[in-house]
Structure formats: C-alpha cells, structure tokens
Amino acid sequence: MDWCRYRFRSVWDLPAPPSRVYGVLERVDEYPRWWPQVRQVTRLDDRTGVARFRSFLPYELVVTAQERRRAPEAGVLEMAMTGDLEGWARWTVQPRGGGARVLYEQEVEVRKALMRRFAVPGRPVLIANHALMMRGGRRGLSAALAV
C-alpha cells in the first residue's frame, strides 16, 4: 500500500435543482465565500487557478488546479491537481428526487514533505481532516443554495 495515496468519495443530497448546484460548483473562484476550508482561489487563466485549503489540522495545502472537463449537460466538472496534492478531482451532479445528488471523487498523492513524513501514523488523522473539510463544504453549499 502506498501510504501517500488517497482516494476519497463523498455523496451529498441537496434540495436544489441540479443546474443550480452545478452553477455554483463551476464558479470555483467563489468557493471561499461558502466553503470555510477553501481559504483562497486565485485564477491564473480561464481554466487554471491556485487554491489554498486548510481544515482542522494546522497546515495549509496549496494546489494548482486545471480544468480537464466541463460538461454541464452531463453534470460533470473535473480537474487535474499539482502541488501539495497531485492527482484529480471530479464533481458529478445528477437529478435526485426533487433536488440533486452531488458526487465528489478525488484521487491524489500527497507531495507535501511534512505530510509524507508522517504518512503511516498520520493517515487516519488526515482522512478525518478531509471528512471535516467535506462536511464544511456540504454545509456551505447548502447555505449558498438557500439564498
């Protein structure tokens, strides 16, 4: 097992139309307004940006994200990531009942030296930290959609 590789999956059911949810998710530079753990997003061009994240643990992750796929008709947004994390992440938004089901998938390798150094003993803590970040994202997105 490569202790520095992670695969995450989160599913959120939201009481908003899929097109509205997708519209919020595709405006990546606005994530810091509703997602507390996304501290900053700086656009480099129309497909690339630098994001800074910090959840519960006292460290910051910095990644450069480049859009790989934007397909509103399929409800898919996908990006490649380099920097402290290297890999990809994807949002898939589909109709579900009267609202939307949001699937977030991510496969990354940790590149940040400190996190690599503590890969084995710190793995459960890093997974819990990610879960807290995703919980904050779900709550923030729900609140943003309620406005």
Question: Which residues are covered by each model-predicted region?
Answer:
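Short hydrophobic/aromatic-rich motifs at helix boundaries and adjacent loops
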Residues: M1-D2, P36-R39, L61-V63, E109-K112
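Hydrophobic ligand-binding cavity/cleft-lining segments
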Residues: M1-D46
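Generic structural detector for well-ordered beta-strands
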Residues: V11-P15, T42, R52, T92, ...
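Short, contiguous strand/loop micro-motifs
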Residues: A16, L77, P124-V125
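Non-catalytic surface loops within mature trypsin-like serine protease
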Residues: A16, S55, A71, P95, ...
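Glycine-rich portal/gate segments that line the openings of hydrophobic small-molecule binding cavities
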Residues: P32-P36, T42-W88, G97, R101, ...
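Beta-strand/loop substructures that line and gate deep hydrophobic ligand-binding cavities in soluble
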Residues: M81-R135
